[in-house]
Amino acid sequence: MTRVEETAINLTVQWLQNNGYESADDYLQTGGNLVQLAEDLYHKETQGDLQSVWGDRKRRDGFAGSLYLAAEAI
């Protein structure tokens, strides 16, 4: 996992906590998309593009899994 991905995960977990979500599932039940949220938060914070670190779908899916696990551990 790259530093960019770690930063995006940390920003997302922090946002979920600050907005009253107790887990990733709480957010997903609202119809939210964790990866899209991570992309948006990362861009807002750094003006960077999270998608630029993903060379293929497998890499993006790995990020999505790591993000979900981190958000479940809130």
Enumerate the language-model features and the residues they cover:
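Amphipathic alpha-helical segments in structured regions that serve as interaction surfaces
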Residues: 3-49, 59, 63-71
